[in-house]
Amino acid sequence: IRTPGGAAGQIVGGVTQLYDMMATCFELAGVTARHTHFARCLVPQLDGTPGDPHRAGFVEGGYNVHEPECFENLPLKPEHIYYPKIRLQNEQPETITRATMMRTTECKLVLRPDGVSEFYDLQRDPRELENVFGHHTYAARQAAMQQAVLDWNIRTSDVTPHGLKDERDMPRDKLRVLAPQKT
């Protein structure tokens, strides 16, 4: 993002996520989000402030082998750019099963309930060539990241829409008593 008067060539280091662009653009435009999101505004980093060195990025996706309607059809020509990917998912569907990934600047964890999970030490293996999932050397870090994935899923999985009218006509102050806010 280039901002008027912003530092030229400023690179935001650390882990960021694509949806951070939304929060950043909202901040720059003076817009308030009208929905729950988990993006972080990167405006301070655009001005040179270091990002959170302990931040993790999370991604989820894929589909299960019992969901063939999600599989892509094989292109007719082997020269097609996606031919190898589509052929692999049709021949070995376990390679595209549902997964959740967590990445920090140091490690990457990919959890698949129906397939091979992965853990990479990005400091030692930045190209992710050696899967060390389950290796005793990384047991503590892997366990901590697995707990962080669970915590992230619980915090972000089921948000309620903004602006819904309470059909019970219960006064808002009574709702706050029933569900006290964190302090």
Task: Kindly label every feature range from the protein language model.
Residues G62-H66, V132-T183:
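Long, internal low-complexity/basic segments
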Residues Y19-F26, G30, V43, Y120, ...:
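Non-transmembrane alpha-helical segments in soluble domains
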Residues G5, G30, P50-H54, C107, ...:
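Generic structural signal for secondary-structure transition and capping sites
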Residues G57, I81-Q89, S157-K165:
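Short secondary-structure transition/capping segments
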Residues I1-T36, R40-H54, V59-G62, P68:
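Substrate-binding rim/cap in mid-to-C-terminal beta-strand-loop elements of soluble/periplasmic
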Residues E60-G134, P171-D173, Q181-T183:
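C-terminal, low-complexity/hydrophilic appendages and adjacent surface loops
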Residues T16-A23, H37-R40, I96, T104, ...:
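A structural signal for well-ordered alpha-helical segments within the folded catalytic domains
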